UniProtKB/Swiss-Prot annotation:
Disulfide bonds: none annotated. CDD domains: Arna_FMT_C, Arna_like_SDR_e. This is Bifunctional polymyxin resistance protein ArnA. In the N-terminal section; belongs to the Fmt family. UDP-L-Ara4N formyltransferase subfamily. In the C-terminal section; belongs to the NAD(P)-dependent epimerase/dehydratase family. UDP-glucuronic acid decarboxylase subfamily. Residues 314-660 are annotated as: Dehydrogenase ArnADH. Its EC number is 2.1.2.13, 1.1.1.305. Residues 1-304 are annotated as: Formyltransferase ArnAFT. It catalyses: UDP-alpha-D-glucuronate + NAD(+) = UDP-beta-L-threo-pentopyranos-4-ulose + CO2 + NADH; UDP-4-amino-4-deoxy-beta-L-arabinose + (6R)-10-formyltetrahydrofolate = UDP-4-deoxy-4-formamido-beta-L-arabinose + (6S)-5,6,7,8-tetrahydrofolate + H(+). The lineage of its organism: Bacteria, Pseudomonadati, Pseudomonadota, Gammaproteobacteria, Enterobacterales. Gene3D superfamilies: 3.40.50.12230, NAD(P)-binding Rossmann-like Domain.
Amino acid sequence: MKAVVFAYHDMGCLGVQALLDAGYEISAIFTHADNPAEKVFYGSVSRLAALAGIPVYAPDDINHPLWVERIAQLAPDVIFSFYYRNLLNNEILKLAPHGAFNLHGSLLPKYRGRAPLNWVLENGENETGVTLHRMVAKADAGAIIAQQRVAIDPEDAALTLHKKLCQSASQMLEYALPAIKQGQTQETAQNESEATYFGRRKPEDSFLDWNKPATVLHNMVRAVADPWPGAFSYVGTQKFTIWSSRVHPRVNAAQPGSVISVAPFLIACGDGALEVITGQSVDGITMQGSQLAQTLGLVEGSRLNSQPVCTVQRRTRVLILGVNGFIGNHLTERLLREDHYEVYGLDIGSDAISRFLTHPNFHFVEGDISIHSEWIEYHIKKCDVVLPLVAIATPIEYTRNPLRVFELDFEENLRIIRYCVQYHKRIIFPSTSEVYGMCTDKFFDEDHSNLIVGPINKPRWIYSVSKQLLDRVIWAYGEKEGLQFTLFRPFNWMGPRLDNLNAARIGSSRAITQLILNLVEGSPIKLIDGGKQKRCFTDIRDGIEALYRIIENTGNRCDGEIINIGNPDNEASIEELGKMLLASFDKHPLRQHFPPFAGFRVVESSSYYGKGYQDVEHRKPSIRNARRCLDWEPTIDMQETIDETLDFFLRTVDIVEKSS
């Protein structure tokens, strides 16, 4: 029987050897290149394959169509996965007529997902095991072919349990693989009601919170003991790792995290105390507990921390280019509300941010990003987070000035992106909902929707493709050079200070500002191509709160993510927006100061925007990533946004224009 194998780690080696021993013909093995940042203590699948004369590959993306085609050409009868770290898509799974099988390190359906070895120890389980199961689209959910139990002894830590699981897996494969080959398997469906799932472990999962019981912390030490990265704590700002420990009953009333004694090195916990048997300072060597306490300068009564304690907390420096714009000025207001941000801003005007100019944590320079390149480079080096918000983002300019759109939106921003790469700075880049173009999906999804634009002779797409190419450049810099980034895509944000009425007079504004100008001047509201195009309108306060959470980046959850920020519940056509705005206008206390409503007028897009324009019928965001990364949900109803936006502009007109 001809097999294609996906394998890594010790389990990968023993799986490959078991297949060879069972008489399988292995056509190819797919594995991973070792990560230099990872401590490699396990066997090499690639070396084993090479010694056995089997072709071996380590692709970056096994699910790429080219690799799927190459696997199809191998014509496998069966597919096996032994601790391969990437999910295989359905296109690969269906290539094997006798099925695809995966070796998992737990007693499924318990502990599906990543790192079951570590999670069972941390959770204090006394039993785990190994499972061979069919592979289906849902991870670790297929029917069970074989299963073997493994007892977890109190003295077991990660490495000893790993060795037990490897031994048990070898025994199980010895009888399971011939059964698969002979078509004599007995399969048991998994009970979904009993399923549990655990994700990839993150560094913060190994923080030792001294408020927890000593038993819980001891289990955490066991779960990530050497050669895993280890459980850790801090003495002030100094990090140290505990490699092995022992639980003691509480011997006094010390506060959690207090050092009860240094010989033995005993630390008070929420319940009981933890004795450090062996440990290591961040730049030191492994040593026994009492020596470690001495090395760390600890005495009885010293306090430990779960997080580093800094005597002086420097404010996070945020550079906003285009700080006077709609998003920039609202974001500045939100950041300055907190005392831990310092905002540096550049723009060609300051009318929208004049209220911040005297704030001690706000630093502004009036200037043009195409001229002030030295200032920009210096402040990118100086700041922690960079938001390049400068762009031409009004549709009429895409057809009126396409080259200027390209020069500013693409070329100037590319220079800023490269500075961020050069100086290792985090960039939060404003992509746009425009990148989805004429996508036909019901909900536009950051990770799966196609980005579809029109022909070259439609210059309205120059903004969309400029932004899309920058998205791709940033993504590539993240993948290849470690750029820390987040892309966010606003969906029709509205609110006070969106454009201004002077911009609307020359057609260079967003839809609602243009409609308000029509009402203020008593001119007809123009409905481009009938105004049936639908958009999802988002209140600026909802949008800014999401953007603020991206800047906060709790748990680094936003790194490398693309995040739609919009309100899918606030969907309306431009015609409906105009009618809602008219109703709000008629109820406004300043209504009497303005001319009568001049009605709606349907106009062709070519006569308004020019011959190079194309419109999009609908644009509704999926906000799955925003919910997952930001714990964010839009809350403000569209009518409230319309009322407040209209009120802001009408009062501006009354104060400024009517008095002139």
